[in-house]
From Swiss-Prot:
Name of this chain's protein: Large ribosomal subunit protein bL32
Protein's gene: rpmF
One term of GO molecular function: structural constituent of ribosome
GO biological process terms, semicolon-separated: translation
Family: Belongs to the bacterial ribosomal protein bL32 family.
Organism: Aliivibrio salmonicida (strain LFI1238) (Vibrio salmonicida (strain LFI1238))
Pfam families: Ribosomal_L32p (PF01783)
Basic residues bias spans: 1-16
SUPFAM superfamilies: Zn-binding ribosomal proteins (SSF57829)
This protein's UniProt keywords: Ribonucleoprotein, Ribosomal protein
Signal peptide: none
């Protein structure tokens, strides 16, 4: 089993944990349909940046 050579300080623990925070999903509203979707992704209706890009 691995054992540390010396105790890690509260500061070092905090610096390590500073990268553990979760980020929220970047959502955007389509100007034509008003639908909420992920940024840089086509909506379910097939619109991207106000233009129809997928014909169903």
């Amino acid at each position: 089993m691995a054992v540390q050579k010396s105790k890690k300080s509260r500061s070092m623990r905090g610096m390590r944990r500073s990268h553990d925070a979760l980020t929220t999903m970047a959502l955007s509203v389509d100007p034509t349909s008003g639908e909420t979707h992920l940024r840089h992704n086509v909506t379910a209706d097939g619109f991207y940046r106000g233009r129809k890009v997928i014909n169903k």
